[in-house]
A protein has these predicted regions:
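Short, Lys/Arg-enriched N-terminal segment that forms or immediately precedes the first helix
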Residues: 8-11, 120-128, 168-175
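Amphipathic alpha-helical segments enriched in hydrophobic/aromatic residues interleaved with Lys/Arg
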Residues: 77-144
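DNA-binding recognition helix and immediately preceding turn/loop
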Residues: 132-178, 197-208
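Amphipathic alpha-helical segments enriched in hydrophobic/aromatic and basic residues
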Residues: 178-183, 224-228
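Short, basic, alpha-helical segments at the C-terminal edge of helix-turn-helix-like DNA-binding modules
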Residues: 183-192, 230
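Sequence-specific DNA-binding recognition helix
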Residues: 195-230
Length: 230
């Protein structure tokens, strides 16, 4: 087992590459698209992706991102990109290991992490059915840069080069969800990140565009009860 950390600036694009063994990618913060020929997954903060061995892929960074990359050679990663469920234990392990230096304790945590990853089930996620349309990409980049519940598709369409109707179609065809479903996932991912940084929920609600704290509280509590995914 090998655990690495990567930090990618907004707008970065890795070259097409593959790995000898399966790779788990956990996104601590940020947002981006992992794509291979004909398919891809859209990752937001708090999500986990499994990349099979030998699958050529690239990572397009929509927002400054920090990732944990785990390589498990003795795992059957299947043949396709998949989103995996993220339990509270996995979140805690990834976050704790990010600053852990003591070798003995770190090895113990890695053993638990490997065991959890081997049994984590598949989850629903934002799967890209084809190459990402550049007009949709502009919308994804804007919302990932500054997550807010206040974004409306009419506002975003003005800078995307597409009509609201076209963007609705692209969300449905390429992500399999509505704009509102995707926006909510991005906003709640950012909320989880800010909470882990110790910020009070009232401040988080304001930063994410909620004028009604009770509406934010309801959405956030529902998010915490569900595995990371749409």
């Amino acid at each position: 087992m090998n655990l690495l950390y990567r930090d990618y600036p907004q707008g970065a694009l890795t070259s097409l590459h593959c790995h000898e063994g399966p790779q788990f990618c956990y996104l601590h913060r940020g947002g981006g698209v992992i794509s291979s020929e004909g398919t891809g997954v859209l990752l937001v903060a708090g999500q986990l992706c499994l990349i099979p061995a030998g699958l050529a892929h690239e990572f397009r960074v929509l927002r400054h991102s920090q990732l944990s990359l785990v390589y498990l050679d003795d795992l059957d990663g299947g043949g396709e990109l998949t989103i995996r469920q993220v339990s509270p234990l996995l979140v805690g392990l990834f976050d704790r290991l990010a600053d852990m230096a003591e070798p003995g304790l770190r090895d113990a945590y890695l053993t638990v992490l490997a065991a959890e990853l081997r049994q984590t089930p598949a989850a629903t996620g934002f799967m890209l059915s084809a190459g990402l349309d550049v007009r949709l990409l502009r919308v994804l980049e804007q919302v990932c840069r500054h997550p807010s519940i206040e974004y409306g598709l009419a506002e975003l369409a003005a800078g995307s080069g597409a009509s609201v109707r076209t963007l609705n179609r692209l969300f449905s065809q390429q992500l399999g969800c509505s704009f509102r479903q995707w926006r909510q996932q991005v906003v709640m991912g950012r909320a989880r990140q800010l909470q882990q940084q110790g910020q009070p929920l009232s401040r988080i609600a304001l930063e994410l565009g909620y004028g009604d704290f009770s509406a934010f509280s309801h959405a956030f509590n529902r998010c915490l009860r569900e595995p990371a995914g749409p």
